[in-house]
Amino acid sequence: MQWEVTRRRAGVGGATMMTAQWWPWVEFDLVRRVPASAFSPAPSVDGGLMTTTRRSQELVPARDRRAYREFVHAAFTGRGKGIAQILGRLVPPRQRRHVNQQLGREGIAASALPKELTAEQWARLFVAYQEWGHGSMRRGSGARRG
């Protein structure tokens, strides 16, 4: 895999949506960089090695996989200047205070971007989101009704 893709998939410098969508069940670890000169013919970029390991303890139950991935997708593609605004659009107005409270408990800045969250933070936000009684996704807005 290309070095930069490997780094992003392993969450170095910020996670991709795909990484965040798999994190509750799989850990990604960067192993090493492989110089382009190690290949024949040599590509124009370095390669990278990484490992994927199934977590011994899931961060989110497998039965919630689809809902969790939809939640992460909505957060990564949602509008807003930070995670507080983005998640605030996913819940009914009366639940927005819960978003800010949960972010505070997690030590996540309101202005943080989705790529800056850890696997554990994503999992705990999802659990909290489920408890807020979000309802079903609204088309176009990425928001949920309550």
Annotate each predicted stretch with a short phrase.
Residues 1-116, 121-146:
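Class I S-adenosyl-L-methionine
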